[in-house]
């Protein structure tokens, strides 16, 4: 669809569009980013995810050129831009506030960057209208920002950013101001637009659902360092430590003691006084402490009689109906509370558990994630 679809056609094959090497940054003597290394590939949707204060926005601002790294190097398409000012980098940013000029029309907002670059007048109108068509707002060209909805303003901000043909588009928590329904819609539209444009998107958020639903790849940060780098599925299903596991969705953490090894893939452990088999290939010996992690949707509840003692036993203490799912809290005999999420089937008489009911908590072998015992996470 015209020029905008080929925005990213000139690049070095096989090399990352952005490479951060040994990046460090401190504010007022406090280290915010410490020796960070990161490659960002051409045409990917990368999300930098982490809690407030983890340094994710600082990384974005250093890529954009709004902050200068104290140490390290930033390469953009194999060119060193560490000391290059923001306006000379082929990188554009969509801010949380969108930063639209209220006195300008939509057309003039999108055209602003082109005029600043002294693009010939004959090129400006077709490029602006192409960008507006790309975000499906060409008919809004003569309106002012206050006449647009939040979602429309967000799309105009994106059109203004992509019309300059950036190599990379940076988005700083740019969906957080939208209501839930609109945010879900924009997640889908952003990913679709990114595929259509072929531009590398780097998206910063603290919202795990946004990261999982939009990204090709997720970087999870804590205290200025990368905790895990992987696909959404890898981050969710195979967290490398307790911080990542707990930050990405709900997780149940069982304390386990090693009994013995069964084969090269499986070991026998004691969980809540019950002998269980889990998958764990690292070296381990009898008595070693481990942590067995299971998502609520990976657990099952089996109703048992009060006289029965099978599986990890507990009593249902709370239930929450969420339409498609029924979430139950089970208090185990040790006092630990476990969250279980089951698909709600109104025709299944056993799914709607009673408060106080005795149940056994089970799971399918190999669905668990097993980690070395972390005292601090």
Swiss-Prot record:
EC numbers: 7.6.2.11
Q: Does the keyword Translocase apply?
A: yes
Q: Where is the ABC transporter domain?
A: 18-248
Subcellular location, in the record's words?
Cell inner membrane
State whether keyword Translocase applies. Answer: yes
Any GO molecular function: ATP hydrolysis activity
Q: Which EC class does it fall in? A: translocase
InterPro entries (UniProt xref): AAA+_ATPase, ABC_SmlMolc_Importer, ABC_transporter-like_ATP-bd, ABC_transporter-like_CS, Mo/tungstate-bd_C_term_dom, P-loop_NTPase, PotA-like, PotA_ATP-bd
- Provide the topology term for how it sits in the membrane: Peripheral membrane protein
Name the family the entry cites: Belongs to the ABC transporter superfamily. Spermidine/putrescine importer (TC 3.A.1.11.1) family.
Subunit composition and interactions: The complex is composed of two ATP-binding proteins (PotA), two transmembrane proteins (PotB and PotC) and a solute-binding protein (PotD).
Q: What protein does this entry describe?
A: Spermidine/putrescine import ATP-binding protein PotA
Q: Which organism is it from?
A: Vibrio cholerae serotype O1 (strain ATCC 39315 / El Tor Inaba N16961)
- Which gene underlies this protein? potA
